[in-house]
Amino acid sequence: WEALRNQYAKSSDYTPATAATQASKDLVTKLMGGGPNPYGTQYPQPVGTDGKLAAGARPLWNSDWSDAMEQQALRTELNLSVSGGGKANQYFFSAGYLNDKGIALESGYQRFNLRSNVTSEMTSWLKGSINLSFAHSMQNYPVSSDSKTSNVITAGRTMPGFYPIYEMNTDGSYKLDDNGDRIYDFGSYRPSGSMANWNLPATLPLDKSERMKDEFSGRTYLEATI
């Protein structure tokens, strides 16, 4: 409201009082375009000419975009190893599993790995060793860039709560589709600079970016004493 009032006050067409009045009249339209009034139809001007909320005005929703685009980053790691042998032969085997959920929605990393090492003194003059390892990893990561519309963390912290994640009725209830499910609000009514036609909580589960990688390595040696 204050920014809008100051914008009007710069014009010679307005006095400080009329600039404040015009800002109160235009606030909802400037922020929401043709979208729903966050304070309901009974408060077409939720902010008065003094810059304060009108008496009784309460937001019908306050969307938490960060919460909608983040998840609990649980980490599970399991490791198992076996080793043994005698004077002439020694062995070591290990296996591991890692599941690291990322903080951003649809992000995470999984890895399975195996490793083995066998050393043997085959004769009094010949000994050798073999070392093998294998790792299979899967990484999911949301599309990201410096743009506030593509960076999950930045977008969640930038988007104001008065823009709803789901389409809302004028009484603050959710609009539902024929199956009784909530309908994502892509904000076609949002003004320029407010990420119109955008809703990452809706598109991230469909816009998957995955990377799978297999790594194998082997080393061996023989040593003969002549």
Enumerate the predicted regions with their spans.
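Surface-exposed loop/interface segments of Gram-negative outer-membrane beta-barrel transport/assembly proteins
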Residues: 1-61, 102-107, 113-217
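Outer-membrane beta-barrel pore proteins
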Residues: 49-108, 119-123
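Outer-membrane beta-barrel transmembrane strands
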Residues: 71-89, 96-98, 200-226
